[in-house]
Structure formats: structure tokens, C-alpha cells
């Protein structure tokens, strides 16, 4: 994964690439560079479990407790949801908008009391906690972020929901059991195109015959 530039500078190399942008004919250097990049992207785009873990850790597990403070700056304070909010008419705060989204998803899933629920990509657990409280059901949340799982487990104890909601540090391909409802919100972007089929097959294997799956992406 190295490029060695001889008898020139990095600036000259980059300027040569820029000069060729938009041209019908590109220089040999530009063509070779483009091909190298294409091969690199192809080889590194295989999102196997180990690679997925590294990607998630790089994005979410930044600086330990200090990293958590970064997310505190822009996430809603009540649920700590990272995905987009639902700003329906009359909504005034981010907290209200995220609650709108939770209520909308819960309604779509048609969750019944006592059902087993799986959240793929649970984030900081806000949606799992809300569903458990609203519907009195058993919720399992999975994530590849150590920081998120630690936060979720501690929060579950604080809320007195640790006997109803559990969180596991596993990949979706490693999940076990059968669930009445499965949902995934804002996580599908991490899957990678080459693994779409594997993702849906994994969900299908985890879903009961009469179950429902909701994908928000």
C-alpha cells in the first residue's frame, strides 16, 4: 500500500493528476494511478467481519470517554440516536424529532407485547430502550463498537431494563436465535454492496416465518 515517487515531488505528482481531470485523453501516469486506485478499492472493499470491526472502531470508538463527548455535542440528549430524525410539522427540537422517528418505526413494525426483537446496529441503545418500555418486550441490540456496547449495558442497568434489554458485541453474521421483529436503522451503509445478499440472508435466517423486518437506510 505504498507509492514511491522518484525524481519528483508529491506536489508535482498531484498537479499532473489535476491537469488531466476532465480531458478526453489522459496521461500514462494518470491512467496508471486510476487503475491502481481501482484495484486497491476492489481489494479493500471486501467487508468481512474483521474489516467491519476495524471500520466501526475507527468511526465510533474514538478517544474513549473523550470520543463520547464528541457525540454528545450533536446527538439528541434523550435517546442519543445517530441516524436522521423525523421533523414532522410542529416539531421544535431534535429530541422531539428523534422521538417521532422511534414512534413511526414502532408503528410500522406492529410490535406486540412479549415479542422478541433484534436491532442490527443498536448505536447507543436509545431505540431499543424505548421499544422495551413502550411494548414490554425482549430486545437484543448488536453492534461492533465497544464504546457503544459498554454504554448500552451501563445505561440498561441505570434504567432498570437489564433484564429486558441485552446488548452484544457481535457482527450481524454471528447473531443467533429467532426473532418476531428485526429492524436496522442507519447501519446498512456499512454493509458494502458485495455483502448485500449475505446481509439479507442473515436477516432471513434470524427472522421467524411470520416475522417482520424493517430496514431504514
What spans do the regions from the language model cover?
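Conserved class I S-adenosyl-L-methionine
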Residues: 113-121
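A conserved beta-strand element that flanks and buttresses the S-adenosyl-L-methionine
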Residues: 183-188
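Conserved beta-strand signature within the Rossmann-like core of class I S-adenosyl-L-methionine
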Residues: 210-217
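Conserved Class I S-adenosyl-L-methionine-dependent methyltransferase catalytic core
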Residues: 4-108, 112
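Conserved SAM-binding loop of SAM-dependent methyltransferases across substrates and taxa
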Residues: 124-136
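Conserved SAM-binding loop
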Residues: 152-153
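A short glycine-rich, Lys/Arg-flanked "PGG" loop and its adjoining helix->strand segment in the class I
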Residues: 197-209
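A short acidic, Gly/Pro-enriched loop at the edge of an enzyme's catalytic core
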Residues: 173-182
Amino acid at each position: 500500500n505504498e507509492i514511491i515517487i522518484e525524481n519528483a515531488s508529491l506536489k508535482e505528482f498531484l498537479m499532473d493528476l489535476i491537469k488531466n481531470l476532465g480531458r478526453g485523453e489522459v496521461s500514462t501516469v494518470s491512467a496508471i494511478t486510476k487503475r491502481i486506485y481501482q484495484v486497491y478499492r476492489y481489494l479493500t472493499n471486501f467487508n468481512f467481519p474483521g474489516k467491519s470491526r476495524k471500520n466501526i472502531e475507527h468511526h465510533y470508538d474514538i478517544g474513549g470517554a473523550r470520543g463520547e463527548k464528541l457525540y454528545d455535542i450533536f446527538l439528541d440528549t434523550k435517546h442519543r440516536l445517530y441516524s436522521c430524525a423525523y421533523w414532522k410539522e410542529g416539531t421544535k427540537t431534535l429530541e422531539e424529532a428523534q422521538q417521532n422517528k422511534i414512534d413511526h418505526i414502532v408503528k410500522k413494525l406492529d410490535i406486540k407485547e412479549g415479542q422478541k426483537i433484534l436491532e442490527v446496529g443498536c448505536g447507543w441503545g436509545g431505540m431499543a430502550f424505548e421499544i422495551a418500555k413502550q411494548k414490554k418486550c425482549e430486545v437484543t441490540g448488536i453492534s461492533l463498537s465497544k464504546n457503544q456496547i459498554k454504554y448500552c449495558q451501563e445505561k440498561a442497568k441505570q434504567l432498570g431494563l437489564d433484564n429486558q434489554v441485552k446488548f452484544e458485541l457481535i457482527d450481524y453474521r454471528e447473531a443467533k436465535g429467532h426473532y418476531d421483529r428485526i429492524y436496522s436503522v442507519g447501519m446498512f451503509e456499512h454493509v458494502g454492496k458485495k455483502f448485500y445478499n449475505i446481509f439479507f440472508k442473515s436477516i432471513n435466517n434470524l427472522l421467524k416465518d411470520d416475522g417482520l423486518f424493517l430496514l431504514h437506510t
